[in-house]
Structures are given as C-alpha cells and as structure tokens.
Amino acid sequence: MRHVSVLHHREEPGMGAGVRAVLGDVSGEVAVFGSLNADLTVRTERFPKPGETISGEDLVILPGGKSANQAVQAGLLGAHVRMIGAVGADGHGDLLIESLQRAGVDTSAVQREDVATGTAIITVDSAGDNTIVVSPGANGTVDVSTAQRHQDVIGKARVLGLCMEVSPDAVEAAARIAHDAGTRVVFNNSPFHPVLSAGLLEAIDVLVVNEHELADMLKPGASDTAAELECERADDATDWADCARRLAAMGIPSAVVTLGGRGPMVIEGEEITPVDPFP
C-alpha cells in the first residue's frame, strides 16, 4: 500500500486555465466549500466479473475530493485559501488535512466528524478505463447549516469554489451567501446535474462544464429557467455564440467549457475566447 503526497491531488477544471482567464489571477482570499475524499486506487489487468475475485497491484491512497482538489490548485497558485468541509477522525482524514496544509490551505473550517472520511474506491484496468464507487462518509454531514456557520469566511472571500459532491441544498446555500456578499461564485457542475435550481443559477458567476454537459444543460427543461434549445451546430462545430446567448438567458454571465486536450473555451457575455491548455 502506498500513500502519495499532495502533488498527486487531481487537477479539477474548477481552478484551471479557463477559470484563471476569467478571473485574471487566482489570488487574494479564496474559499472552497465541499468535498474531501481519500481516493483508494487499485490497478488490475481487467475488471472482475460479478462474484469473481482477481488480483491487482498495490493499493495507492491519494488525497482527493473535487473541492479539496480545487483548494490545493488555488493554494499552489498563491491564493490564500480556506477549505470548508468535513473529514472523519481517522487516518484518511489526517492524510487530507496534511495534504491541504502542505499546499498552504487553511483547514480551520474543516470539521472532524465521528464518522469515516469520504472515500472513492477506484479500479483501473490495463486500457485505462475505470470504475468508481464513492462513499460520502463525512461529506454527508456538510449541509445548509455548515454554509451558515461559515458565512463570514464565504463573505470575506474574493472567490468561492463549489462543486456538486455534497448536498445540493448546501451548495445552493453557500452560493447564495456568496452572491449576497459580492463574492464571485465559480461553480464546477461535477458530478454533473442537468437540472439546477433557479436560486443556484442566479448566484453563479462562472460555470465550469465540459461541452457535452453544456449541451445537456441547454436542452429543453434542463433547468427552472432553461433556454428553449441546445446550442445549434453547423458542420459538426459548436455554435459558441448561440451557446453564449442561451447561457445569458439562463442568467449565467460567464462559462468555462472544457474540451479535453484542446484546452477550454471561455464565454464572457458575447465574447468567445479559446484558451491554450495549461501546461
């Protein structure tokens, strides 16, 4: 079994090159509200069949959780970051706290709960495909009251980072607190939710999605205030100007649309800007 250092936090689009293109530089006070997980990964030649036991390589334990990954990225970029969330009173919780602190993240708003730390059980086969089962653990204790208890942290931040790995009600509560305080809300819609409440949509300053998720969000009925049609396409190319108009109709002023290895597309009002992948 191997434990791996802070540098092995996965890079999340929530603080990537596209978001930095919108915000300028990710500096000053940044708050991140959400999930912390220990990623337990085993590589194996193939996935087992139902009821089958097979051998794999050594277990690798990585610090993770989409929100924790965002916090580490922002910390390594020089921002003063405060993480708001929860871990268990166990070794995985210790690993996550230590990894955040090594990146310069303030963990004083991370609660230690009398439950297991959230974990992701990941199996990777020889082709690089994976299966993931997430046990929320302490992340399940992050609720609306968590956001309310830390409204001073959220309100003093220049930017609030959010994703959807904790309760949607808690995410909306944190977003509303930030919006009312003038804090910019960067919302990474991951794990993807095609339907978002009007209250959350109104609070989002920067939406982060991939191109397929964007199309799903812009389908009829995808949200309380959704535009009527998904982005029109011509010659198999996305009509980014049309996407921008439809996002504006939903009340979202800016978006970062990730395109895999091609780098993200940044939408700011009517401006459409391709951004080179961050090295």
Predicted regions and their residues:
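Glycine-rich phosphate/adenosyl-contacting loop at the front of the ribokinase-like
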Residues: 2-86, 91-95, 101-102, 276
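Conserved phosphate-binding/catalytic region of the ribokinase-like
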Residues: 2-10, 16-30, 194, 222-279
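Residues that scaffold the ATP/ADP-binding catalytic core of kinase and kinase-like folds
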Residues: 41, 133, 216-220, 267
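Conserved N-terminal subdomain of the carbohydrate kinase-like
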Residues: 50-54, 61, 76-161
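Conserved beta-alpha-beta core of the PfkB/ribokinase-like small-molecule kinase fold
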Residues: 159-242, 262-264
